[in-house]
Each structure stands twice: as structure tokens, then as C-alpha cells.
Amino acid sequence: MKMTSKKMKDELMKKLSRPEWDFHYDSEKEVLRIEQKDSKKGINVSLPGVVAKWEVNKEKAIEEVAYYVQEALIAMHKEENSAAKILPVIRSTSFPKQAEEGNPFIMTDHTAETRIYYALDSNKTYRLIDERLLQKLGLTEQQVREMALFNARSLSYEFKQDTVAGNTFYFLNTNDGYDATRILNESLLQSMREKISGDMVVAVPHQDVLIIADIVNEIGYDIIAQMTMKFFAEGHVPITSLSFVYEDGDFEPIFILAKNRKKTDGKEKG
């Protein structure tokens, strides 16, 4: 049979068919481009050159080119992933649990209002890790969690502060996409706990802010409630309008504490 560029294109597409790769054929230049769907990085194959090799080596020529393209694309993908970081992100418990039907995200419970997801961050963009991506990365869920928490501890933090009616409010807003993630840095929380004299209240109304407050009176609780609601309404990626009292590594939603206070007050009146 006579081999043409179009037939060679079909042969290579059969050999290199993978769900994560795309093909683009330029019939004028007789070039087939194979590229990664996510990154758009790829390889251009000049088909007349492959046809010339096929005239001499037949099937072996196709095998060699397919092998070269496959190895090059896999190497690009590994290089891309090695440059990427895995970081945790905080989301509301109402956030979707699946990327698509049958492909759940990797998640960890956090509080009654929040859940931890995991992002593969390549500086320009990030993608939440689901089971299919986990398999491509060749990692276990435990490895992802450990890597993410380690990287979360390396995130810098510098708070702005404001004092109202004796209550001090600390704001973190770097806009790096991971401000709320700092709530997972246990050493940061412990260091703040040491400098706080009243109740330590923490809020993550949306992904680009972390609020830590030193609450010493009821006015402080009213202020943090209003503040959290305002930030929640304005956030690009809202998380929760509730704030939490932090004590001994636990987060207790404020509305639960308020209910408990009301019950106690009721008993005392009776």
C-alpha cells in the first residue's frame, strides 16, 4: 500500500490515543501536533519525514515516532507536576463533593461548617485534586494530606490589626488564594493564642481573608459577627458567615456557644 501523510496521521493517532492528549492536524503543512489538554504543551510531528522512514522501516518507523512522542509528553507532564505544589484550601461544607459523576474530590473534614480540599498549584493556576488526578500524580490520599499541610506551614503571614471597644482584631489578606488556608497552621494559631488575653475567635468568611480576634466583651462578639457576615457577602469564594472560638486545637461555632449561653441563662432564671 502507498503511505501518505494523511494515513500516517491516522496511524499515529491510533497509537497515541489517550484521554489526556489532544490532536491537531495541519493539512497544508502536513504536521500533526499532539498536546496535553491541561497545559497545551506538546510535540509537532512532520509527517512527510515519518513517511520517508516508513518507506524503509515500515511499522518500526511508526513505533519509534510514537514512542518518542509518548516519552516526551510524559516527561513534560512530570516536569510540570514536580514544579507544582500541593496546598490545602478551605471550602464550605455545601461545596460540591465531586468534580463530576463518579469522580470525587479528595477531602478532609475540618469543622461543622468547613471542609478541606487539596489543590495542585502551578503558580498560574490551580486545580482541586480528585481521584483521577490523584492516580495520575501517583500519590496516596495520606501523602497528599501530609504534603499539603507541610506546604501550608510555609505560607507567610503578616497581620494588620485594629482595636474596637477593647477587642483586638487581626486581619490576614495577602490575596494569594490561600489566606483562609492559614487556619490550618497550628503553630500560627498557638502563637496567636499566647498573645490573646480574652477569647480567641477565628473566622474564614471567604478564601482571601483570615480573621483572628481577641474578644474581651459582648460588644466584641457583636462586632466579629457583623464583620464576618460582611466579608462573607463580599467574598469571591465565600466559605462561612460563622466565626469560631478556638481552644485547645478545637473550633466551636459561635452560634452553638450562644445557644448554650441562652440555655444556661434560662436555667438560672428558673
Swiss-Prot record:
Protein name per Swiss-Prot or TrEMBL: UPF0354 protein BCE33L4443
Organism: Bacillus cereus (strain ZK / E33L)
Superkingdom assignment: Bacteria
Pfam families for the chain: DUF1444
Family listed: Belongs to the UPF0354 family.
Matching InterPro entries: DUF1444
Record-annotated disulphide pairs: none
